[in-house]
């Protein structure tokens, strides 16, 4: 068994699956573009919290990427239905640290920061992918604990006003209240909040996708996702929810199009784009294409994060994998809400590209 296959099969073999020179694009209009996307020499991506923790997963060197696993220690890592990343990038002598998403509970996030030796208050910026509680859940507690500890002017970057709207999940069996992130409370605790609906550079080394264009015909927002309408004219009124143009009363539930969801990305020198979808409600392929358009760069080194395909029918999974083949990233690192169905499809169709992350996994891209 070659080294690549050894790493790819690590989590599968142990019985655990994580559910974790450049060319320019020359076609298609770009609504907004980063004129000179920053390049990093090295990028270290740590899954601080993910849906599973696989103590037996294998690590090692895989071509241009190093995969490091966290063994059992005195402070065991906690996994939950949530996602949080610590991102450490460098260019020359400049280092930047970014916190991306904040899991569901503060006890898992704080425990894992401690176990992994991460100081969250050393972060240069915070990025929130969207307004679901399994991504923002621990942010209020982190903001409270960080008063007086953050770097001056540290900012939370969100993709749109709907990040701070009340969300609900409605299924035939139950209704789940996702709650609402309190923006004024974050600001009162010393965090600035900045909305980036257009592609934007973060801390000089990262960048966000901006609002994600819906290009594919097979990627649709989850049917169960709802937003609770706010007062007319407010940031959470139904007319602000993207494709929704309906008359509603405050308190009504309307379809959630995830207008404010955004992806986070890096351009690794001589490798290409590393694109982190977080949850992928807008579509993992749409997210990748959005970053390609925003940067004008075609080459994708890695696609990382939750792809939100666990509940997807086989046809959608097959079309997603076919689109991955066309994009041809060097690596695919599915996490969080991707689903075993999609992980196995990638393993079957693109085995040489699959790396299985879980809670505590560190992946080093570049030098």
What feature does the model see in each segment?
Residues 1-14:
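N-terminal secretory signal peptides and thylakoid transit peptides that target proteins
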Residues 106-157, 295-304:
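Active-site metal-binding motif and surrounding structural segment of the metallo-beta-lactamase
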Residues 201-266:
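Active-site-proximal loop/helix segment associated with metal-binding centers of metalloenzymes
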Residues 51-54, 59-116, 257, 261-276:
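Conserved beta-strand hairpin/beta-sheet module of binuclear metal-dependent hydrolase folds
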Residues 44-49, 98-101, 206-212, 273-279:
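Active-site-proximal beta-strand elements of phosphoester/diester hydrolases
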Residues 160-188:
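Active-site neighborhood of divalent metal-dependent phosphoester bond hydrolases
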Residues 1, 21-44:
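C-terminal segment of N-terminal export signals and the immediately downstream linker at the start
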Residues 125, 132-136, 155, 241-361:
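Cap/insert and terminal regions of metallo-dependent hydrolase folds
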């Amino acid at each position: 068994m070659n080294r690549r296959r050894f790493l790819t099969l690590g989590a599968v073999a142990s019985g655990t699956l994580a559910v974790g020179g450049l060319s320019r694009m020359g076609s298609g209009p770009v609504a907004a573009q980063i004129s000179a996307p920053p390049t990093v020499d090295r990028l270290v991506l740590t899954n601080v919290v993910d849906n599973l923790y696989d103590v037996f997963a294998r690590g090692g060197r895989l071509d241009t990427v190093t995969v490091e696993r966290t063994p059992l220690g005195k402070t065991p890592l906690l996994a939950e239905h949530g996602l949080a990343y610590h991102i450490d990038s460098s260019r020359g002598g400049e280092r930047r640290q970014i916190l991306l998403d904040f899991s569901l509970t503060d006890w898992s996030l704080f425990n894992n920061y401690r176990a992994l030796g991460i100081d969250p208050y050393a972060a240069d910026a915070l990025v929130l992918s969207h307004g679901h509680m399994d991504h923002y859940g621990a942010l209020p507690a982190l903001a409270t604990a960080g008063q007086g500890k953050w770097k001056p002017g540290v900012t939370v970057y969100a993709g749109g006003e709907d990040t701070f709207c009340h969300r609900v999940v409605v299924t035939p069996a139950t209704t789940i209240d996702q709650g609402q992130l309190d923006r004024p409370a974050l600001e009162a605790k010393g965090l600035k909040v900045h909305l980036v609906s257009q592609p934007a550079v973060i801390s000089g080394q990262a960048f966000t996708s901006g609002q994600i264009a819906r290009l594919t015909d097979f990627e649709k927002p989850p049917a169960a996702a709802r937003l609770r309408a706010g007062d007319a004219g407010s940031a959470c009124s139904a007319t602000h929810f993207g494709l929704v143009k309906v008359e509603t009363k405050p308190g009504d539930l309307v379809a959630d199009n995830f207008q404010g969801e955004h992806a986070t990305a890096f351009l690794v020198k001589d490798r290409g784009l590393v694109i982190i979808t977080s949850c992928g409600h807008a579509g993992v392929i749409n997210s990748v294409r959005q970053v390609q358009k925003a940067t004008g760069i075609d080459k994708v080194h890695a696609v990382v994060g939750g792809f939100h395909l666990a509940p997807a029918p086989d046809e959608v999974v097959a079309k997603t994998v076919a689109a991955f083949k066309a994009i041809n990233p060097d690596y695919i690192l599915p996490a969080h809400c991707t689903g075993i169905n999609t992980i196995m499809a990638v393993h079957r169709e693109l085995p040489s590209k699959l790396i299985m992350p879980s809670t505590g996994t560190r992946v080093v891209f570049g030098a």
